[in-house]
Structures are given as C-alpha cells and as structure tokens.
C-alpha cells in the first residue's frame, strides 16, 4: 500500500513537472515571438517567417499567440505596421512611397490599401487630418 501511494505521488509530481515545462515553453515561445516581431515587423509580414525562426509550425505559433494575447499573429503584425505608419505620417515629411518602402511594402498602392483597410482612411487623409488638428490647436 505504501509503495502504491509512493508511485501515485511520483506519477502526480512527474505530470506536474511536464505541465510546468509545457507552460514555460509556451511562455518562452511567446516572449521570443514578441522580440522577433518587434525587431522584424517592418520587413517581415508573414507568419511563416516567425514560425521558421522559432522552429515551430505556423499553426502552433498561432495557437500560442492567440492563447497568450487573444489576437492572431497577423493582427499583431498589422497593428505594429499601422502604429509605425501613423508615427511616420505624423512625425516626418516622408512621402507615402517612402513610408511604404520603410515598412516593407513593394509599392505605395499596396501600402495605401493596407492602411485604409486597417484605419478606414488613406495615409494622406490621415496626415491631412493631423495637420488640420494641429492648426486648430494653434488657433485656440
């Protein structure tokens, strides 16, 4: 009876260790993905790049990211691209073509479609709206 109890406890502890390792592996993958996407989102827009770098399948990466953030990998990449585009539109005089190039788009038209799909406005409309707001704030 004592041996059986000991084996049950050993089995229980080994399962807890495996679960802990799985959790920490998922946390590690999520941290590594975050570091990779923060460094590479301007050039790399595809899930396959990040999965390859992490040596895991795209599906596994998608599950880990969704479980950890509530968002898809593509959503995270797109949010970072939009945030960077807004920053460049508001703080530089770069052309839309130059911004498109900096953000890894092959042409300005593709970037404009992407920006409008994600913000509801064209890049130039966004920039013009900011300039109007700045001008209004100066008049107050």
Language model regions located:
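Amphipathic alpha-helical segments enriched in hydrophobic/aromatic residues interleaved with Lys/Arg
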Residues: 1-2, 35
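Core residues of bacterial helix-turn-helix
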Residues: 54, 103-104, 115
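Short, Lys/Arg-enriched, Trp-marked, Pro/Gly-tolerant hinge/linker segments that flank
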Residues: 11-35, 39-54, 67-75, 79
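Short hydrophobic/aromatic patch on the recognition helix
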Residues: 61, 110-111, 115
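Terminal helix-turn-helix DNA-binding modules in bacterial transcription factors
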Residues: 67-109, 128-140
